[in-house]
Amino acid sequence: MVSTHLTSTTLPDCYRSLIVNSELGSSALMDLNSPSFLYPLLHTPADKGTLCTYQAALGKVYASLEVIGVGDDKLQAVHGLNGGKPHRDILGSRITRPTGIKPLCLPRHILAYDWLAQSLLGIVIGSISLAYNELLMMEKLKGFRPFVPHIPFDFYLCEMAFPRVKPAPDETSFSEALLKRNQDLAPNSAEQQIEEVRQVGSYKKGTMTTGHNVADLVVILKILPTFLTMLTNETGFEISSSDATVKILITTVPPNLRKLDPELHLDIKVLQSALAAIRHARWFEENASQSTVKVLIRLLKDLRIRFPGFEPLTPWILDLLGHYAVMNNPTRQPLALNVAYRRCLQILAAGLFLPGSVGITDPCESGNFRVHTVMTLEQQDMVCYTAQTLVRILSHGGFRKILGQEGDASYLASEISTWDGVIVTPSEKAYEKPPEKKEGEEEEENTEEPPQGEEEESMETQE
């Protein structure tokens, strides 16, 4: 008959280990405290306190007993952690140092079956290994605080929880002002001089020959072509006239990025930026072709130009923000333009683009990259407090001033203003940039401590 017995032994620093006494033919004692048995699991003696705790191992044994069909009545007979009561909640991520743990003895009616005893022996040893791996992981993560982003308040995501006590205000004039501003910003047919860009020649036909690697592009204009100037830069070149500019960006296929020679080829960041622009255009065409989204983005670009606090917002961030404000709601139906415009300012004011916020994930990048992390902490704060001021002005009827229909309004974000007897005080910045270290201080620090890397300190948040 095969019998299995589990008991406890005392280790330095009050740690517990397991002794597995297996009578298989000849009696053999396997003490988990012995270096010969610990080496495959620990690679170090057990006296350093790295052995998995008795609590975690027993928790897995209890779970294993339940898996193989041992009922609650039989588990009551298993002496263990909670005065003989079965434990099912010891499999969590918390592993603590055990105190006052009783020995574990499997009941005789369980040990009456050879197959069950052998299974339990394997379960115990396997559980010890798993528990130890969990403990090692916890030791590595000790003191590490995982990043858990917060979700800023968005009224339109929880509108049902805040029922109105008054009828919705009439915003017809606000909607008309938005449409009027969009009409002023949209280029007319005369300004849109490019009709089409076509690939032609042997490249388009697929009849190119060796030694004549030339691709022909034809730009069809709506106007009479005049003499143009060409300006080369690090990203490609620009063809411009007094009224319009065409930018030509150069890149390569993604597999070639690993083969670039810095002394021979273009900067990899330039090539990656052009590839990203292609992904952005493709995503926008597939997901943001709704007319309200396009109008809102045009208005946001105008807002960025007229208010310095919004300058850090890149065109791609504005694209995603406009799409989010119009389409991301419980009904999955596009919101009205006036509602979406107000929502943009509200969620920016609530901290959508602050360091701890969930923000907006870039749909064209891998790894859950939050688009606002391209901004510095100072810029993120500036966007937030500028939006807070404009939200208060908008709430008191100052939309014409915000839209630029009543002259320059850039001062509103930094000066006190009055709207229908209500005084609006601009929000103040919450982030203070750390003082820059002097050259002498940096040299002293370098002499005291050896450098640990070549990376410069950056204010950009990292994922």
UniProtKB/Swiss-Prot annotation:
This is Interleukin enhancer-binding factor 2. Forms heterodimers with ILF3. ILF2-ILF3 heterodimers may also bind to PRKDC/XRCC7: this may stabilize the interaction of PRKDC/XRCC7 and the heterodimeric complex of G22P1/KU70 and XRCC5/KU80. Forms a complex with ILF3, YLPM1, KHDRBS1, RBMX, NCOA5 and PPP1CA. Identified in a IGF2BP1-dependent mRNP granule complex containing untranslated mRNAs. Interacts with IGF2BP1. Interacts with CRBN; this interaction promotes ubiquitination and subsequent degradation of ILF2. Ubiquitinated at Lys-166 by CRBN with polyubiquitin chains by the CUL4-RING E3 ligase (CRL4-CRBN) and then degraded by the proteasome. The modification Phosphothreonine is found at residue 461. Residues 108-444 form the DZF domain. The keyword Protein biosynthesis does not apply. Residues 429-440 have a biased composition (Basic and acidic residues). There is a cross-link at residues 259, 437 (Glycyl lysine isopeptide (Lys-Gly) (interchain with G-Cter in SUMO2)). InterPro entries: DZF_dom (IPR006561), DZF_dom_C (IPR049402), DZF_dom_N (IPR049401), ILF2 (IPR052134), NT_sf (IPR043519). It comes from the Eukaryota. It comes from Rattus norvegicus. Residues 424-463 are annotated as: Disordered. GO terms for molecular function: DNA binding; double-stranded RNA binding. The modification Omega-N-methylarginine is found at residues 94, 145. PANTHER family: INTERLEUKIN ENHANCER-BINDING FACTOR, INTERLEUKIN ENHANCER-BINDING FACTOR 2. The keyword Transferase does not apply. Keywords: Activator, Cytoplasm, DNA-binding, Isopeptide bond, Methylation, Nucleus, Phosphoprotein, Transcription, Transcription regulation, Ubl conjugation. Chromatin-interacting protein that forms a stable heterodimer with interleukin enhancer-binding factor 3/ILF3 and plays a role in several biological processes including transcription, innate immunity or cell growth. Essential for the efficient reshuttling of ILF3 (isoform 1 and isoform 2) into the nucleus. Together with ILF3, forms an RNA-binding complex that is required for mitotic progression and cytokinesis by regulating the expression of a cluster of mitotic genes. Mechanistically, competes with STAU1/STAU2-mediated mRNA decay. One of its GO terms (cellular component) is cytoplasm. Pfam families: DZF_C (PF20965), DZF_N (PF07528). There is a cross-link at residue 166 (Glycyl lysine isopeptide (Lys-Gly) (interchain with G-Cter in ubiquitin)). Signal peptide: none annotated. GO terms for biological process: positive regulation of DNA-templated transcription.
